Every structure is written in C-alpha cells, then in structure tokens.
Amino acid sequence: KAVNLYCELKKVCPTLDSLDIGGGFPIQTYLDFEYDYEYMAEEIVSQIKLICNQNGVPEPHIFTEFGSYTVGESGAMLYSIVNQKKQNDRELWDMIDSSFMTTLPDTWAINQRYIFMAINNWDSEYERVNLGGLTCDSEDFYNAEVHSNAVFLPKMELGREQYIGFFHMGAYQES
C-alpha cells in the first residue's frame, strides 16, 4: 500500500526519492528463535522494485525504523534474588533486588517477553518459581503464564547467592 502511494506521489512530485517503510523487524525473545532476516530484507526490496517497475517509477531510497532489531541485543538487566518466600502453601516466589515495573516495564505493561536465564549455579537442581519485584504493588511480578508457562531457577540454598538475567531488552527499557 505504501509503495503504491509512493508511486502515485512520485508522478506528481518528481523530486521525491525516498520511502520510509517503518519498523517491525522482530528480535530474538527466546533462545530457540529462528527468523530468516536476509530473506525478509530481500523480499521487501524485491516487492518495492516490482511495484515501482509496474508503475514505471524509479526505485526509491529505502529507510527503515527497525528500533528493537537495531539495538535490542545491546541491553541486559541482571538481578540478584534477595529472598524466597512461600505463598498459599505451594507457590514459591523468588524476590529480585529491584522492580519489574521500573526496570523492565514492558514485562508487565504489555507482556513483553525477553530471554531469561540464571546467571550462576547452573549445575544445581532446579525448581519452578514465580518472580516478584520489591515493591508492594500486586503487578510487580514476572508473568510466567504469559512468557513461558514456567520459570525454573536453581534451588535456593542458604548463604549462596543467585543471579538472573533478562537479555535483548536494549530498546525502550531502563538500563
């Protein structure tokens, strides 16, 4: 649609020479993510060329706004687990040394997913836990149901520190 509009405008404004196709390139949000970026870029360019050729219009300079794709991998948030508590006699909660609401707001605001993993104690036995932030707000938690159906971390041991990390969150988050 945008390319057709470009072709119409190019005919009335011959100096028009650029097209901004916006954003939308996906970013890796889980470890087994596979996406053929090269294919998609080639497909975008070939479709623009095809439509311009069909309309007898020179191909434009193409601009993109792939913000998350461009900078997403540049960011990571590391937290330490400061406490573990049991709720409802069955739910284990690991509490981080910060707040998801202030440092990773998109995890609770729009259920954004990020690559998440333990930083240390990988050789330990793992357990299913919920992750909570330090605020008293009931929304300050990592929604495991939305993100991965379960969060597994090394079992907590008295006197042993545990660190976790969220990765590829360089766009639009606090870092």
Predicted regions located by residue number:
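Conserved N-terminal phosphate-binding loop of PLP-dependent enzymes in the Aspartate aminotransferase
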Residues: 1, 36, 59
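Active-site-proximal beta-alpha core segment in soluble small-molecule metabolic enzymes
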Residues: 1-18, 27, 52
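Alpha-helical scaffolding segments of alpha/beta enzyme cores, especially the outer helices
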Residues: 4-8, 39-50
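Short connector loops at secondary-structure junctions
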Residues: 17-24, 132-137
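Glycine-rich beta-strand-to-loop/alpha-helix junction loops that act as flexible
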Residues: 19-28, 64-69
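Glycine-rich tight-turn/loop motif centered on a GG-T
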Residues: 29-38
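Charged (often Lys/Glu-rich) extended helix/loop segments that serve as interaction or gating elements
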Residues: 43, 49, 53, 57-175
